[in-house]
Curated annotation (Swiss-Prot):
The keyword Electron transport does not apply. The chain crosses the membrane at residues 1-21, 30-50, 57-77, 79-99, 104-124, 137-157, 172-192, 204-224, 230-250, 257-277, 280-300, 322-342, 360-380, 400-420. It comes from Thermus thermophilus (strain ATCC 27634 / DSM 579 / HB8). It catalyses: a quinone + NADH + 5 H(+)(in) = a quinol + NAD(+) + 4 H(+)(out). NDH-1 shuttles electrons from NADH, via FMN and iron-sulfur (Fe-S) centers, to quinones in the respiratory chain. The immediate electron acceptor for the enzyme in this species is menaquinone. Couples the redox reaction to proton translocation (for every two electrons transferred, four hydrogen ions are translocated across the cytoplasmic membrane), and thus conserves the redox energy in a proton gradient required for the synthesis of ATP. GO terms for cellular component: plasma membrane. This is NADH-quinone oxidoreductase subunit 14.
Length: 427
């Protein structure tokens, strides 16, 4: 049902976009995404399969997160061109497909269905972001080639294109490694992260919100289905948490800093992936989507483009609501109680300890402590003496979304049991 709704709205708005005003297309896109989300919730815990397309618990949890990010993105954007909303809708369709299949050919189609709109969205404001978007496109094409080659080797090793087919030997291991490279690019795992800082810095802030939340959720849904070698996952965890956190320390622009932060968080998610616990990964992603979405929603009200760190100074004095919301987002990303980010990291780290992955666990703990320097620096900057920069508060609905995300982060921090049973039923 979710697939049908997204497909119908995508095709219908492609045809009607030329006659409807842009705001009409935006409202219709929001309606389509909301209906897709409602259908997902109404069928929660009820598996469905049709050929290679299969809705299961993993699909439902990660599609939910992707749709939340898509709704937030469309709500924040004020574009005079209807194509923007169509691109988000088509990307959301690709994300749902990616999360809802084990078949490598359909997975490849889904990857391209979500990637092509993202390349266009990254170049939406031409000029400073064009070079970064070109890098994103070229590296994305290379990652797709790795994935395709991995699928071919997987078929050669197992005689099947369905993930989970039994296999062994060096050809099978190489196939899984190449699939991991292709999906690791979308998840922004180091060392496949080189596009992330430039694209985040050069793209419009709502587009960055979409990339940092929805795309990451869909990528990890696919990664969860790939039985990647534990040694390879451990290496990706180590590289991501070290590169992401250390590089973030030297940044002077907020979106670029959060890009490196997202690389580090991809490493923590990969730690949950390493243990094979879908519930821990799903909860971590939920808290990450809420906190990261909240941070970028605040940044989008400061500037739709680049946001130097100085622009955050004194935000609380200019707008107490946005200042407090940004502080909540930073503290949740850091993983401090009583916010939801604490339980996300706790579940991932506890599962790693239970699995005996002490090496990567210690590294994750140390780098998480290092991240306190820049998260607290960003969060407390909002209380400093304000810079003399123009500031115009966003519309009421955007502020309401900020409040809702902040309240959810606090509520899930105090009562994580509100969603853990549902995630267990889904995952």
């Amino acid at each position: 049902m979710t697939l049908a709704i997204l497909a119908v709205f995508s095709v219908a708005l492609t045809l009607l976009g030329f006659v409807l005003p842009p705001q009409g297309v935006k409202r219709a896109t929001l309606l389509g995404l909301a209906l897709a989300l409602a259908s997902l919730l109404l069928t929660w815990g009820k598996p469905f399969a049709f050929g290679p397309y299969a809705v299961d618990g993993v699909s439902q949890v990660f599609t939910l997160l992707a749709l939340l990010g898509a709704l937030w993105t469309v709500g924040l954007v004020r574009s005079g061109r209807f194509e923007f909303y169509l691109l988000v809708l088509y990307a959301a369709l690709g994300m749902h497909l990616l999360a809802s299949t084990r078949h490598l050919l359909l997975m490849l189609v889904a990857l391209e269905a979500l990637s092509l709109p993202l390349y266009a969205l990254a170049t939406w404001r031409r000029g400073q972001g064009l070079e970064a978007a070109l890098k994103y496109f070229l590296l994305g094409a290379l990652a797709a080639a790795f994935f395709l080659y991995g699928a071919a080797l997987f078929y050669g090793a197992t005689g099947s294109l369905v993930l989970g087919a039994p296999g062994e030997g060096p050809l099978y291991a190489l196939a899984l490694g190449l699939l991991l490279v292709g999906l690791g690019f979308k998840a922004a795992l180091a060392p496949f992260h080189f596009w992330t800082p430039d694209v985040y810095q050069g793209s419009p802030t709502p587009v960055v919100l979409f990339m940092a939340t929805s795309v990451k959720a869909a990528a990890f849904a696919a990664l969860l289905r790939v039985a990647a070698p534990p040694e390879a996952l451990a290496l990706l965890v180590a590289l991501s948490v070290v590169v992401g956190n250390l590089a973030a320390l030297a940044q002077k622009e907020a979106k670029r800093l959060l890009a490196y932060s997202s690389i580090a968080h991809a490493g923590y998610m990969a730690l949950a992936l390493y243990t094979g616990n879908a519930q821990a990964l799903g909860f971590y992603l939920l808290t990450y989507v809420l906190a990261t979405g909240l941070a970028f929603a605040v940044l989008s009200q400061i500037s739709p483009d680049r946001v130097p760190l100085e622009a955050l100074r004194g935000l609380y004095r200019k707008d107490p609501l946005l200042g407090l919301a940004f502080l909540v987002a930073m503290l949740s990303l850091l993983g401090l109680p009583p916010l939801a980010g604490f339980w996300g990291k706790y579940l991932a780290f506890a599962e790693a300890a239970r699995a005996g992955a002490w090496g990567v666990l210690v590294l994750a703990l140390v780098t998480s402590a290092v991240s306190a320097y820049y998260y607290l620096g960003l969060g407390l900057a909002v209380f400093a003496r304000p810079e003399e920069t123009p500031f115009r508060p966003g519309p009421p609905w955007a502020r309401a979304a900020v409040v809702a995300a902040g309240v959810l982060l606090l509520a899930l921090g105090l009562l994580p049991g509100l969603v853990l049973p549902a995630l267990a039923a889904g995952g």
